[in-house]
Amino acid sequence: MKQFRFIDLFAGIGGFRLGLEAVGGICVGSAEIDQQAIKVYRQNWPTDRSEHNLGDITTLQQLPAHDLVVGGVPCQPWSIAGKNQAFDDPRGQLWADVIRLVRINQPKAFIFENVKGLIDPRNRLCLESILDSFKAEGYNVYYKLLNSFDYGVAQNRDRVFIIGIQQKLGVPDFSFPEYSESEQRLYDILDNLQTPSIIPESLPIQRNLFGERIEVGFNKLTPRGAFNDFFILNDIRNGPTSIHSWEIYATTEREKQICTTIMRNRGNPRYGDCDGNPMSYQDIADLVVDLAESELQVLIQKRILRQYEDGKYEFFNRRLSGGIDGTYRIFLPHARFFGRLTARGMHDEIAEISVSGATAEAYKQNFIQQILIPKRHRPITVNEAARIQGFPATFKFHSNQSANFRLIGNSVAPPVIMALGKALPNDHLFEPELCEV
């Protein structure tokens, strides 16, 4: 395996570095300004010289001698759920600095990572501008949306990767790495989970002619005909693995009927333009026979409903991702992946045991009785989050736990970077005599 030198821009805690060092890369400089990230980075690479951190990329010009430049460019402006400010946001302007550094230093190749929002149709002009800028500097450019799950990471995490290779090198076209399915389960990588004797039947992942995974069912990583291996706690959606507050709290059959009726009808356009709308007492009374308003007041006392100033009723837990009592999804130990780790934190937890069932309803009731009611579920730890992201168990963090979760959520998954590093045509890119350090 040939060695090559690389610059780690927006280094974070070193996800790119871990992946590239595993395939012969030698980091000759990193750039990061987040002090908490720098502290974690230094803990894990303590022998780096002080000048190894190049600092703020907006002030950089000439970089240390290198072959490859990599980095996860700050991505918030491209969020599909955000305001799509893109280049109008100062963080979006960092792309201009990346392009400038490529122009000045002319690396043989580069790898840049971003959120999937970058390839959203609303951001098409911005993406084309980035690609055209790199092409104008003499690079063949390739991009693709990759999911970490396809490269052995226990996480459903989509990211866009942009690869550039100098045209004048005349190397073969770049091909993104083949998928590498993993048989691991969460009980293989998380702590103190019970290995189930029976795992609910799953079918093989289905792929199209291009090898891309076919999205099926309620969750794209759950095979058709199989049970989800997680449960969603929410009051605004229904499904075989959805758990509602009225199924958890003490409620009568009549109260369950009222809640289910509201859930099924709140999206009706007659009540408003939103996906789910508050409903008046009369709206609900038209659907529930002999409804007394006092019945709705009891559901308010049980923190299932709330009432607005205009008198309309809505579920207390009205946000899907907010879950119930702060928990959104609970993954079972036999699950093949955990929820997507984010810098803003998450409301997902892990169950201590797995359950099964002959039918969807039996599966759901076994979960409620054996896991939910006895509270046999918990948040994941920092070290578990790191392993879910593909970091080694030996990776070191500092004492600020909330900062650690943020840093992990911001990081790239090292196994994906390792796969991309292996896919580079290094026999043509990296000559031995140019790799002395």
UniProtKB/Swiss-Prot annotation:
Keywords assigned by UniProt, alphabetized: DNA-binding, Methyltransferase, Restriction system, S-adenosyl-L-methionine, Transferase
Q: Which CDD domains match?
A: Cyt_C5_DNA_methylase (cd00315)
Q: Name one Pfam family in it.
A: DNA_methylase
Q: Where is the SAM-dependent MTase C5-type domain?
A: 4-431
Which reaction(s) does its UniProt entry say it catalyses? a 2'-deoxycytidine in DNA + S-adenosyl-L-methionine = a 5-methyl-2'-deoxycytidine in DNA + S-adenosyl-L-homocysteine + H(+)
Family statement: Belongs to the class I-like SAM-binding methyltransferase superfamily. C5-methyltransferase family.
Function comment: A methylase that recognizes the double-stranded sequence 5'-GGWCC-3', methylates C-? on both strands and protects the DNA from cleavage by the HgiCII endonuclease.
This chain belongs to which protein, by name?
Type II methyltransferase M.HgiCII
What does UniProt list as this organism's lineage? Bacteria, Bacillati, Chloroflexota, Chloroflexia, Herpetosiphonales
